[in-house]
Amino acid sequence: MAARKTYILKLYVAGNTPNSMRALNTLKEILENEFKGVYALKVIDVLKQPQLAEEDKILATPTLAKILPPPVRRIIGDLSDREKVLIGLDLLFDELSESELNGGKKNK
């Protein structure tokens, strides 16, 4: 069995607003269902750490960034659609490729 990739993600939010909390909860649900044990998520409140938002050129919240594996991908705004989040971060392709590799060949 091949080793699974580890995904490093950053979620930039602006305080504990309903929109920020909804984005965080939706994202955690997606990650726990699809990538349990193979991800690290760092939540950055841009109101408390504006220097991090500036360094990473974050212009709007919520913004989700996939840092590793490359390439870096970002989604800005609504994170409620699981498929759009996975496609936007290039994670759906990884998920499909892995399932094809694991189940694609049948022995007769």
Curated annotation (Swiss-Prot):
Its biological purpose: Component of the KaiBC clock protein complex, which constitutes the main circadian regulator in cyanobacteria; it may modify the ATPase activity of KaiC.
Protein name: Circadian clock oscillator protein KaiB
Annotated family: Belongs to the KaiB family.
Subunit structure, as described in the record: May undergo a major conformational rearrangment; in the free state forms homooligomers. When bound to KaiC switches to a monomeric thioredoxin-fold (KaiB(fs)). The active oscillator complex is probably KaiC(6):KaiB(6).
Keywords: Biological rhythms
PANTHER family membership: CIRCADIAN CLOCK PROTEIN KAIB2, KAIB-LIKE PROTEIN 1
GO biological process: circadian rhythm
Comment block on domains: Has 2 forms, fold switches to a thioredoxin-like fold (KaiB(fs)) when bound to KaiC.
SMART domains named among the record's database cross-references: KaiB (SM01248)
Family matches, as Pfam families: KaiB
NCBIfam families, per the entry: circ_KaiB, PRK09301.1
Entry annotated with the keyword Hydrolase: no
Matches recorded under InterPro entries: Circ_KaiB, KaiB-like, KaiB_domain, Thioredoxin-like_sf
Species, as recorded: Prochlorococcus marinus (strain MIT 9515)
Note: The kiaA gene has been eliminated from Prochlorococcus during genome streamlining. It has been suggested that the central oscillator in Prochlorococcus does not have to be as robust as in other cyanobacteria because the former live in specific niches of the Earth's oceans; they divide exactly once a day and at the same time. Thus gene loss and changes in kaiB function compared to other cyanobacteria, can occur.
